[in-house]
């Protein structure tokens, strides 16, 4: 499926607006946007089946691949249906929300929206926590299963690999059958998989199951942003998205802290998996009251109900236009790889995010090297050294609403037309903090020096990490508005590859080069990457003009 150039950029979308905008099933939704009231909106592809005679831009419900905008699925009419003159199907009508429709997630109470937001954000933390919690007691894994540390490290890496593969199936599946059922089924499987992890008789069993834990446990990381977009209007969701953005990094940071104390207290790494199972099960119970939030699925259910009860021919565009299996595979697998090979913006931003994510997972193995091997601390005390990273995460969490407010002010001043490079402010602020933390860690990690230096190096790193991630996701969504799900899928694959790879060689790197020079080298790599957001801020418009997928 060739990439189609578009000049649509009137989006006010923020991060995760949806993380599946160009998912195959998402492409087939009736885009419920009144184009008469939004004249800047254009369609990049006219449907051959739903609109055989072309699309009149004076009518709503045109099939478009424009910017991700939740309002597209929020058109309200007095009767809850709209007869689109572009459909030559007699009396068939398209279903909409009714005025002030109580089933429309945007009309739910703020208290209920915040419950959904907090539950989804905590599920992200819980899922990410599960990937790194075993890092707190890998020494016991090596001893009990009689393997070397490099093999034991795979129990962390393979779950992160699963994080990169699982979304390729989970994302399109959620668009077809709804987010809730995918959440409930996959997380229950994830909970059950903790049992063979805890009872694993050998390392092969543990590693295989940990990979599948990543494939099924990635659901919150994949869907939570979309759920938040489902229930909040664009201008309301800044703080909600900030909570979500912290989760993928707060969770892994908490893992070694908790896992270390479990290992110290029990002397058995298997208890880590029992505790993780209990933790996710408690979170699973909080998810049960949350209903389906994805508007296209809710409207499809409504159309089916109306047809069954009244015989009235009411449909959604999703029902009228289905993609072939080949198209589904093409969008979800081929396009992310195509973008990675052809889009310099995506390559650079994804590579930067992968570096940060890899460094975070590198810390999980660097801290034991410094504090256990170098200073003689136990795993529990070493876990406490991750607290400054969490302090930095909280600092970034406090900053993101101000960035959103600044962005919205620029948007209003520009008559609602966005410039993607406005999103780069947060990345420009964040990028110097990352090498700062690494260099502090490098030259304070001598065994003879007090613990404060290497421990508190995590604060600037944690701050820059989350602030960069938040802004980078926003930027990719704004740049690749028509293909943002593919862009984000590509970013996730690269990020997961980085996070999975670093634990496999970081110990060798520190032992071979010394801790100081190893992290000095990594710090210099991060310094070399600082110009990336500044370059795109200055020249991003020119780079986008040469792109086949980015908006101009």
From Swiss-Prot:
Entry keyword set: Membrane, Transmembrane, Transmembrane helix, Transport
What SUPFAM superfamilies does the entry give? MFS general substrate transporter
- Give the span(s) annotated as Disordered: 1-59
**Matches recorded under InterPro entries:** MFS (IPR011701), MFS_dom (IPR020846), MFS_trans_sf (IPR036259), Sugar_transporter_CS (IPR005829)
State any single GO MF term.
Answer: spermine transmembrane transporter activity
Q: Write out the annotated subcellular location.
A: Membrane
Database matches in PANTHER family: MAJOR FACILITATOR SUPERFAMILY, POLYAMINE TRANSPORTER 2-RELATED
The molecule here is called Uncharacterized MFS-type transporter SPBC409.08
Q: Which organism is it from?
A: Schizosaccharomyces pombe (strain 972 / ATCC 24843) (Fission yeast)
């Amino acid at each position: 499926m060739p990439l189609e150039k578009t000049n649509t950029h009137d989006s006010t979308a923020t991060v995760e607006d949806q993380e599946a905008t160009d998912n195959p099933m998402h492409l087939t939704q009736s885009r419920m946007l009144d184009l008469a009231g939004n004249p800047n909106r254009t369609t990049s592809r006219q449907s051959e089946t739903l609109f055989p005679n072309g699309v009149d831009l004076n009518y709503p419900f045109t099939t478009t691949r424009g910017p991700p905008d939740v309002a597209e699925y929020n058109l309200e009419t007095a009767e809850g249906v709209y007869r689109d003159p572009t459909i030559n199907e007699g009396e068939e009508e398209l279903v909409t929300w009714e005025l002030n429709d109580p089933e429309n997630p945007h009309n739910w109470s703020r208290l209920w929206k915040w419950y959904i937001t907090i539950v989804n954000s905590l599920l992200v933390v819980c899922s990410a926590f599960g990937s790194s919690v075993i890092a707190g007691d890998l020494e016991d894994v090596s001893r009990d299963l009689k393997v070397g540390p490099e093999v034991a490290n795979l129990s962390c890496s393979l779950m992160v690999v699963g994080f990169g593969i699982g979304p390729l199936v989970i994302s399109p599946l959620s668009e077809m059958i709804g987010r809730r059922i995918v959440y409930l089924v996959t997380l229950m499987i994830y909970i059950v998989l903790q049992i063979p992890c805890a009872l694993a008789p050998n390392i092969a069993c543990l590693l295989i199951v940990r990979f599948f834990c990543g494939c099924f446990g990635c659901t919150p990381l994949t869907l939570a942003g979309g759920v938040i977009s489902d229930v909040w209007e664009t201008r309301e969701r800044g703080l909600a998205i900030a909570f979500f953005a912290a989760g993928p990094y707060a969770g892994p940071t908490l893992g070694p802290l908790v896992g270390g104390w479990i290992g110290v207290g029990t002397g058995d790494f298997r208890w880590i998996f029992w505790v993780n199972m209990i933790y996710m099960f408690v979170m699973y119970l909080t998810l049960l009251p949350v209903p389906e939030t994805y508007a296209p699925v809710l409207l499809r259910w409504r159309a089916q109900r109306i047809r069954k009860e009244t015989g009235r021919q009411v449909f959604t565009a999703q029902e009228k236009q289905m993609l072939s299996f080949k198209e589904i595979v093409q969008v979800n697998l081929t396009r992310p790889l195509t973008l990675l090979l052809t889009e310099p913006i995506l390559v650079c931003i994804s590579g930067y995010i992968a570096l940060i994510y890899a460094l975070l997972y590198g810390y999980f193995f660097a801290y034991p090297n410094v504090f256990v091997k170098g200073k003689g601390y136990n795993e529990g005390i070493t876990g406490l050294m991750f607290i400054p990273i969490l302090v930095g995460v909280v600092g970034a969490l406090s900053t993101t609403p101000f960035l959103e407010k600044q962005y919205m002010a620029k948007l209003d001043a520009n008559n609602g037309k966005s410039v993607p490079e406005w999103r780069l402010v947060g990345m420009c602020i964040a990028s110097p903090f990352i090498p700062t933390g690494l260099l502090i860690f490098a030259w304070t990690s001598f065994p003879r020096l007090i613990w404060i230096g290497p421990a508190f190096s995590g604060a600037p790193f944690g701050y820059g990490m989350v602030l960069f991630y938040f802004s980078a996701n926003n930027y990719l969504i704004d740049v690749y508005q028509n293909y943002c799900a593919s862009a984000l899928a590509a970013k996730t694959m690269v990020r997961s590859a980085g996070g999975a790879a670093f634990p496999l060689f970081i110990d060798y790197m520190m032992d071979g080069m010394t801790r100081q020079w190893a992290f000095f080298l990594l710090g210099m790599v991060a310094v070399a990457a600082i110009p990336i957001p500044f370059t795109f801020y200055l020249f991003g418009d020119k780079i986008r003009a040469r792109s086949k997928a980015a908006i101009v």
